[in-house]
Curated annotation (Swiss-Prot):
Source organism: Mus musculus (Mouse)
Subcellular location: Cell membrane; Golgi apparatus
PANTHER family assigned to the protein according to its UniProt record, in alphabetical order: MESOTHELIN (PTHR23412:SF6), STEREOCILIN RELATED (PTHR23412)
Classification lineage: Eukaryota, Metazoa, Chordata, Craniata, Vertebrata
Lipidation, GPI-anchor amidated serine type: 600
Disruption phenotype: Mice have normal growth and reproductive function, and normal platelet counts.
GO biological process: cell adhesion
Name the record gives this protein: Mesothelin
Tissue: Highly expressed in lung and heart. Expressed at low levels in spleen, liver, kidney and testis. Present in lung (at protein level).
Bilayer topology: Lipid-anchor; GPI-anchor
Length: 625
């Protein structure tokens, strides 16, 4: 029952008792809460509508309206209104979610003064295109604000975050992989994303900064941190000279230390530090579960009792206490008699101690002579252990793959094959069959150069989800293999097969594909390589998607559709009639210097991305509308 229907009933009874009785009736039927919700919602919509229609003072709006802001509501605002709303968010110190900030950023004017920039929420600036601030002074001011923002609003290794880091380094004048303390301060949270090559060449500056980073380091960063700390050529000195204060200063970097570094730290220092952090475990959080056992084992090591040192692996070891196994058993003896280790029914805890002894004996990885004899002991090694190995025998690989079958050891099996390929081995059909129960996502774990050893026939088995974690280089190589595998297939059947691999297709290949009426779905479109996609015109994308072109609207604020929109002229997008926004406004000229930023091993310069500039004097000559 709607409220207008209720009013005459209330009005027809002059008695307060009658009114109260009617309200009780409504309450018992559950109508009052609905009426309240409807009234509140209508009131909020009216307030927001009033603001959109001319209420200049956004700061007077209730905080709840900001927190519930949707992209649809933002899209109805003018650029000036969006700017006022964003400034009110900063003024009221409201924390919006990432998608809300992105929507607001897209509706802001293309030209912002320093004063306007200063008045915007810091986290919102993360979603602005750095190309909006050309010139040293403008970019320096922009990135001085970015350095104070919470960069973790953007996912690690996301395209937006990578672009911000590239442009920040370029603005700072950093070329190559050397950064100064001033550079790191200017980068702020973005410095946590600097690749391992920067860590290796700027360890004095970066190590203290990385120690305070919230997110986990990537593989290249961890490797570089370990190498520079192991060398002793840092402000912390060699691990053998470290103190409790040194370990405190390392903070989260303690979690990346390997066995060889931990063993070099004085035992009394480790014991004291363990007591120190046990009083306040929150300082290291979840990292404590990784660090504590590693340090405790080494700190509490005792001497072997007289007469207890074994000279062979036998059943007597079953009755040793764990600390006696730690103190008395020799790793080289275990390696020589691995067949006996597998035969005797040792407990899981005892086998873990044996593994620790082997790891200490071979800190750089097990020799192949031991790997060949591992047998069932292979179940106790980790993928990280295997990455250190050098395996050249295909028989060894096949034997260990049989051991791992049905043991939930996919990661170890993949690491083993990758290790074998890295040593120059070839992936034959027997190995592919042995890996048959493992999702083909393992292709992404192989190094790009090792993919050449993968038979083309495997491409017939690959599904879209198998390539989700592949790098761009992986996708490019797998795409070429897929083209070879499907060369005798044509028409729509070819498209159905090749679309899984289109993330590695070049812009030339995509242009050719657009001529065949494939009607690509939006899910496949989103997996296309950004560098290839942005090279396509509006007309080419329209041909590529066919009737699915309408789905662009739902993805316009997400990569890669957003990146493609940034490179198109707004007038061309308007012709689609989909209401797509974010294109290049009339009066702007796109200069693409086509110089790639290089965080790869082959390049040392950071090149500029595309830049939008306005040149009034050239407009008549260039006939820009």
């Amino acid at each position: 029952m709607a409220l207008p229907t209720a009013r005459p009933l209330l009005g027809s009874c002059g008695s307060p008792i009658c009114s109260r009785s009617f309200l009780l009736l409504l309450l018992s039927l559950g109508w009052i809460p609905r009426l309240q919700t409807q009234t509140t919602k209508t009131s909020q919509e009216a307030t927001l509508l009033h603001a959109v229609n001319g209420a200049a003072d956004f700061a007077s709006l209730p905080t709840g309206l900001f927190l519930g802001l949707t992209c649809e509501e933002v899209s109805d605002l003018s650029m000036e209104q969006a700017k006022g709303l964003a400034m009110a968010v900063r003024q009221k110190n409201i924390t919006l979610r990432g998608h809300q900030l992105r929507c607001l950023a897209r509706r802001l004017p293309r030209h912002l003064t320093d004063e306007e920039l200063n008045a915007l929420p810091l986290d919102l600036l993360l979603f602005l295109n750095p190309a909006m601030f050309p010139g040293q002074q403008a970019c320096a001011h922009f990135f001085s604000l970015i350095s104070k923002a919470n960069v973790d609003v953007l996912p690690r290794r996301s395209l937006e975050r990578q672009r911000l880091l590239m442009e920040a380094l370029k603005c700072q004048g950093v070329y190559g992989f050397q950064v100064s303390e001033a550079d790191v301060r200017a980068l702020g949270g973005l410095a946590c994303d600097l690749p391992g090559k920067f860590v290796a060449r700027s360890s004095e500056v970066l190590l203290p900064w990385l120690a305070g980073c919230q997110g986990p380091l990537d593989q290249s960063q961890e490797k570089a941190v370990r190498e520079v700390l192991r060398s002793g050529r840092t402000q912390y000195g060699p691990p053998s000279k470290w103190s409790v204060s040194t370990l405190d200063a390392l903070q989260s970097l303690v979690a990346v230390l390997d066995e060889s570094i931990v063993q070099s730290i004085p035992k009394d220092v480790k014991a004291e530090w363990l007591q120190h952090i046990s009083r306040d475990p929150s300082r290291l959080g979840s990292k404590l579960t990784v660090i504590h056992p590693r340090f405790r084992r080494d700190a509490e090591q005792k001497a072997c009792p007289p007469g207890k040192e074994p000279y062979k692996v036998d059943e007597d070891l079953i009755f040793y206490q764990n600390w006696e196994l730690e103190a008395c058993v020799d790793g080289t003896m275990l390696a020589r008699q691995m067949d006996l280790v597998n035969e005797i029914p040792f407990t899981y805890e005892q086998l873990s101690i044996f593994k620790h002894k082997l790891d200490k004996t071979y800190p750089q990885g097990y020799p192949e002579s031991l790997i060949q004899q591992l047998g069932h002991f292979f179940r106790y090694v980790s993928p990280e252990d295997i990455h250190q190995w050098n395996v050249t025998s295909p028989d060894t690989v096949k034997t260990l793959l049989k051991v791992s079958k049905g043991q939930k050891m996919n990661a170890q099996a993949i690491a083993l094959v990758a290790c074998y390929l890295r040593g120059g081995g070839q992936l034959d059909e027997d190995m592919v069959k042995a890996l048959g129960d493992i999702p083909l996502s393992y292709l992404c774990d192989f190094s790009p150069q090792d993919l050449h050893s993968v038979p083309s026939s495997v491409m017939w088995l690959v599904g879209p989800q198998d390539l989700d974690k592949c790098s761009q280089r992986h996708l490019g190589l797998l795409y070429q293999k897929a083209c070879s595998a499907f060369q005798n297939v044509s028409g729509l059947e070819y498209f159905e097969k090749i679309k899984t691999f289109l993330g590695g297709a070049s812009v030339k290949d995509l242009r050719a594909l657009s001529q065949h009426n494939v009607s690509m779905d939006i899910a496949t479109f989103k997996r296309l390589q950004v560098d290839s996609l942005v090279g396509l015109s509006v007309a080419e994308v329209q041909k590529l998607l066919g009737p699915n072109i309408v789905d662009l609207k739902t993805e316009e604020d997400k990569s890669p559709v957003r990146d493609w929109l940034f490179r198109q002229h707004q007038k061309d997008l308007d012709r689609l009639g989909l209401g797509l926004q974010g294109g290049i406004p009339n009066g702007y000229l796109v200069l693409d210097f086509n110089v790639r930023e290089a965080f790869s091993s082959r390049a040392s310069l950071l090149g500029p991305g595309f830049v939008l500039i306005w040149i009034p004097a050239l407009l008549p000559a260039l006939r820009l509308s």
